[in-house]
Each structure stands twice: as structure tokens, then as C-alpha cells.
From Swiss-Prot:
Lineage start: Eukaryota, Metazoa, Chordata, Craniata, Vertebrata
Listed name of the protein: HERV-H LTR-associating protein 1 homolog
Glycosylation site positions: N58, N97, N139, N161, N179, N200, N217, N232, N321
Segments of skewed composition (Polar residues): 384-398
Listed Low complexity bias regions: 403-415
């Protein structure tokens, strides 16, 4: 009994210690698990939050840096584009064939509602390797909402059974394209409204052009335009071979090569490829620089000289010498011993034509004109001022450039008729692949043709064959896109020219309504 009592307290003590130790271990284990849970839960959350904040900051910074980089890249691209713009003289618009375009417009107008209003949209792109000109025609759903202030200039062309030749109008369209691509850029350049209207009161089908320049900011204007174009043409061509023309070399001012001359012996009509640099060698070039006022006025009147425009010197006469760049720059190597005199005035009514044109007979020129009228091809796009190659060749009998008389007051000649040859120094050599420096700022153009004040007025080159079939009004349309005010300034127009310049009153009202 005593032994049992003696052994009882240690057992109880041991049992109590065991329970205490067990409880201690259990509590410490629970505390350890709680700490582990807290360590597993709280620290990762804080770490992820910090990383998220860092990522957000880095993302915004990267986005801002990326936007700044894109802006810098865009600015640099625009700068590069500005330095690599190719002028229009390096673009061969002879590949444009707008005959199908005009025929499609006529078929649409004659088949549907006798009225077809459309937008001629011209967009051009440029690079070192190619150029692309897109010509699209969009149908206008409601032409009455067109603001006439944005399209102030209107030109109409009457197409009837008597005037069924579309070469003049297609030449006008080519000139519009050439004017809009005066500097090829990657922006929207030009917009013109074309309308084809047929009325029962007249036998004419009026093709009207409302010319105006606009951009992509005219959202209200483009809302009324159908999304898909009715007619869409894209012309691509390489320009790497004509990059030398922008550097002022004389390669573009050559008339024809020997191979072309051999091909022209059967007197087939072949248009020589002449760029604006060749046409710019025609007008008078003043050696002294023009005043700032003249430059400002010329830039305000004509911001960009259209392709194929012949400019005439219209500044006041001065005592400075006026020299003229010859037509055939490096073609004259030797002059014949006996120079032939050259007349200073030419009568267009003479059947044999101008003496400097080496034509075999009048029948050949008539056949050429008929062939030009019969073919549906376009006139040469450099302002339809390009003559056939054999017409552009100077006569071999003309010899050296003879000095001619010069009036003290140069007039504003509308179109060249006589090749004026003023005093050119005999010691001026014609070096191949070189061309005398010209001052393009001195070229100014007149709005409308004015009658010559004197018989021996200063003029440039003979009137081309293609120019003769154009009425004076259409000549001015293709040149400057000015209104038909030619007949007001020049009163000796024929009735046919006046009928082309002045629109009928009903048609004028119809155009005003639209």
C-alpha cells in the first residue's frame, strides 16, 4: 500500500509533465504554422505589389519613350521625304490613258440619269525606285451640298456630234493630274469635281470640271462621297532612270537621238519625250534677278507652274541683256558655211507651213492630224505642248541661230509662233552634257493670251500641231486652270472660240445649282 502511494506521485508528476510538454509542443507547433502561413501569405503579396508598381511605371515610361521614338521617326521620315521629293518633270505621265475613264463617265451619264457628278481624287506617292499616281473617281450622292467657295473654278467642255474628239478633254485631265503631282508626296494632293450633264435643249453633252485643292480635313465633304470609287486607276513607273533630270543636266533637253531620227523617216507620228526642263529652256531668261515683289506676285497667282506650261517674260523692260537658251542645246556641233535668214513673222494661212519645220508636204501634216484625231490615245501629258519628233527637229537649212530684231517692250505672248533668235555670242560653245544655268524664278506666265502689239514682237517657238486644234479657251484651261476670261481681254476671237469660252445661260444656271 505504501509502495503504491510512493509511486503514485511520480507517476502523476510525470503524467503532468508529459501533458505540459505535449501541450507546449502543440502550441509551439500551432504558432510555427501560423508564422509560416503569415510568411507564405504576406511577403509574396507585398513583393508582387511592388513588382506591379514597378511594371506600371516602367510600362508608362516605355510607352512614352516609344511614342517619342515614333514621333522622332515620323519627323525624320518627313524630313527624308522632303529631301527626296521628285519634281513632276521626272515623272512620265505619258503612260496615263484616261480614255476609258472619260468613256466610263459618259456611259454612266447617258445611261442613268443624264447627270453624273463625281470627284476626281488624285493621290501620289514617291520614292527612289518608283512613283505611283492613283486616279480615283467617286460618285457624289448630293452635289448640292458642295461649297462653291472650295471649288471656285469651273470649266466646261461641249461634246457633240460635231466635236466628238475627246483628245482635248483627256489632255485637260492629264494636265490636272500633272498639276496635282507637281511635287510627288505621300499626302492627298488635289480634288476636282467632274460632272457630265446632258440636256434636251442642247445637243451638247457638257463635261464640266470644278477645280479646287483640298485635303483630308474636309470630313463633311467626304461624307457625301461613296466609299468605293466608280473608277480607279493606279499608274506605277520607275523614276530611277530620270533622277538626272532633277539635277539640271542637258540629257532631258535633247530632241531625238539618231535611232529615233531613223525611225522617223517614214514620217510616222512619234511624240518625243520632252520634260519640263526642255520646255523651260524656251522662254526668255533674264540675267538679272527679279525683284521680290515680282516673285511674290508670281507665286501668289501661280503657286506651281503646271506641267507643260510655256512661260513668257512679263516683267518691265530694263537695260539688262536678255539671253535665250537655245532649243537644241548640244545638237549643234558644226554650223554650215552659208547661214540662211529666218523670217520673223509667219502667216498661219500659208499652206506650206512654217519654214523651219522640215515637213515633206501639206498632205503629211494633214494625215498626221487625222491620225491624231482617229486614235484614242492621249496627247503627250507635258501640257500637250510637245510636238511630234520630226516637227520638233530644227530645219537643217536654218543653220546657225541668226540674230533677229528685238523690241524694247517684250509682250506677254500666249503661245509661241516664231523662234526668236536674239544676239547670241559666237564664242558661246555648245558643250555636250552641259547646259547654261537658268533662273527659273524669272519665268512668269500670263493669264490669257493678248494680241501682239507689234509685228516683230518677241515670241519663242512655233505653234505645235496639237496646239492648233485646241481653241484658245481650252489652251488656257490646260495651262493655268483660270476662268474663261480670255475672250473678254482678246476681242478678235472667232465665234467658235467665244462659244467655247462662254457657257449657255441655262447650263450656267445648272452648274450654279450644283
Amino acid at each position: 500500500m505504501q509502495s503504491f502511494l510512493l509511486h503514485c506521485p511520480p507517476i502523476r508528476l510525470c503524467m503532468g509533465l508529459a501533458c505540459i510538454l505535449f501541450l507546449w509542443n502543440a502550441v509551439s507547433g500551432l504558432k510555427g504554422e501560423g508564422k509560416k502561413d503569415k510568411e507564405m501569405a504576406l511577403p509574396p503579396a507585398t513583393v508582387s505589389g511592388n513588382e506591379g508598381l514597378k511594371k506600371e511605371k516602367n510600362g508608362s515610361f516605355l510607352h512614352a519613350a516609344e511614342s517619342v521614338f515614333k514621333e522622332k521617326k515620323m519627323v525624320k521620315g518627313l524630313e527624308v521625304l522632303a529631301t527626296t521629293e521628285l519634281p513632276a518633270r521626272s515623272v512620265d505621265l505619258s503612260t496615263l490613258n484616261l480614255t476609258e475613264l472619260v468613256n466610263g463617265m459618259l456611259n454612266r451619264a447617258l445611261k442613268d440619269s443624264k447627270q453624273f457628278f463625281s470627284v476626281l481624287s488624285i493621290t501620289s506617292y514617291s520614292s527612289f525606285a518608283f512613283h505611283k499616281v492613283s486616279v480615283a473617281i467617286y460618285n457624289i450622292s448630293n452635289p448640292k451640298t458642295v461649297d462653291p467657295a472650295k471649288f471656285p473654278t469651273r470649266h466646261c467642255y461641249c461634246l457633240s456630234n460635231r466635236t466628238n474628239d475627246l483628245s482635248d478633254f483627256t489632255a485637260l485631265l492629264v494636265d490636272i493630274v500633272g498639276n496635282s503631282t507637281s511635287y510627288l508626296t505621300e499626302i492627298f494632293k488635289s480634288t476636282s469635281i467632274l460632272s457630265v450633264t446632258q440636256t434636251n435643249e442642247s445637243d451638247c453633252v457638257f463635261i464640266c470640271v470644278m477645280v479646287g485643292k483640298s485635303g483630308r480635313n474636309l470630313s463633311d465633304f467626304w461624307e457625301m462621297v461613296e466609299k468605293s470609287p466608280v473608277i480607279n486607276y493606279t499608274f506605277t513607273s520607275g523614276v530611277s532612270s530620270v533622277l538626272a533630270t532633277t539635277r539640271g543636266t542637258a540629257r532631258t533637253s535633247r530632241l531625238t537621238t539618231q535611232s529615233q531620227q531613223s525611225l522617223l523617216r517614214p514620217y510616222s507620228v512619234r511624240w518625243s519625250t520632252q520634260w519640263v526642263s526642255a520646255l523651260k529652256s524656251l522662254p526668255w531668261t533674264k540675267t538679272s534677278a527679279p525683284s521680290e515683289k515680282e516673285l511674290a506676285e508670281s507665286k501668289q497667282m501661280f503657286p506651281e507652274l503646271p506641267v507643260g506650261t510655256i512661260g513668257t517674260h512679263s516683267s518691265a523692260p530694263s537695260s539688262s541683256n536678255m539671253t535665250r537658251t537655245p532649243w537644241g542645246t548640244n545638237r549643234y556641233t558644226q554650223a554650215p558655211t552659208v547661214p540662211m535668214p529666218m523670217p520673223l513673222s509667219v502667216d498661219d494661212s500659208t499652206p506650206e507651213g512654217p519654214p523651219w519645220a522640215s515637213l515633206p508636204s501639206t498632205s503629211a501634216s494633214i494625215e498626221d492630224a487625222q491620225q491624231l484625231r482617229s486614235t484614242g490615245n492621249l496627247l503627250h501629258p507635258t501640257g500637250i505642248l510637245t510636238t511630234p519628233s520630226r516637227l520638233a527637229q530644227p530645219s537643217r537649212a536654218s543653220g546657225t541661230l541668226m540674230p533677229g530684231t528685238q523690241t524694247t517692250n517684250p509682250t506677254q505672248a500666249p503661245a509661241p509662233r516664231v523662234p526668236q533668235t536674239d544676239g547670241i555670242p559666237a564664242e558661246w560653245p555648245f558643250i555636250p552634257e552641259k547646259e547654261p544655268a537658268r533662273d527659273p524664278a524669272a519665268h512668269q506666265v500670263s493669264k490669257c493670251p493678248r494680241p501682239l502689239l507689234q509685228e516683230e514682237a518677241i515670241t519663242d517657238t512655233p505653234l505645235p500641231l496639237a496646239m492648233k486644234k485646241l481653241t484658245p479657251c481650252l489652251m488656257e484651261l490646260c495651262r493655268f486652270f483660270q476662268q474663261c476670261l480670255c475672250a473678254i481681254q482678246k476681242r478678235d476671237f472667232s465665234s467658235e472660240a467665244i462659244s467655247n469660252c462662254y457657257l449657255p445661260e441655262k447650263i450656267r444656271k445648272l452648274i450654279t445649282l450644283h
